[in-house]
Amino acid sequence: MKGKVSFTLGILGLITSYFLAGDEPKSTIFKISLGLVVAGIVEFLVFLYENRKRWNLLKTLVIKPNSPVRVTMAYLFRIEVNGRYVLIKRHKKDNPGYQPIGGAYKYLKEENRELFDSLGVEPCNHVPRDEDTEHDLRVIIRKRKKLNKFLQWFDSRKNREMDPYREFIEELVEPELLPAGTFRHIKYVYIGKHIEGVIKSPVYPVDELRYADIFELRTDNDAQKIAISALLNKGDEIYFATPEEIRAGSTKDGIRILPHTFKILPK
């Protein structure tokens, strides 16, 4: 933790100066030690200020710092049509229901190998992985005290996926729910991020942190607007949910809407 070394040395110096004989060496050691204590406090306060947006995560440095944490770094699309939000059916048996278009960010394995080894980052195998999910940023950090350094790497945008276009294509265009020719390019805006502190997982045998960037699709022309509206006619693969249904966690017909869906709603 920032400032800990200086502060500790300063405290030890102050204690030592108390037992020293002779005014001059005692005064010198006292002044040096007091300076180290002040420097340690200042360094710690600067650290708190620089990480002010993550104060709720700083507790990982002192509360169970050596315990593992599961981390999911994802992005979600907000696609709104006349006050309703486009959701897609999730077919995996472990957690079925409707959810926003989106998914986990990908990372570059070889480019991040040295960093991830130093941070104790390893794949999360609580959910079976395959060649499509092998490089998903759903990982285990063996010691949660390394969590802030991991998030600093993520914020640097280095050696990881940054564009949400891939999941849009995989979930809507490749299954031919949207015409490929109309969506060769898309426009979107970054709305913000939703990050939860480390919480007890309702599913996995380890605490977890869930992060999601929210992007809003901006249709670029009439053809895109018509195609998005036509998703309403794609059967039960797509559902246009009201904010009330999303908050309630189910459609009007009682079909489950997954809990993380609320993140796409305006705050």
Question: Model features per residue range: what roles?
Answer:
Residues 1-267:
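N-terminal leader/linker segments that precede catalytic domains of diphosphate-processing enzymes
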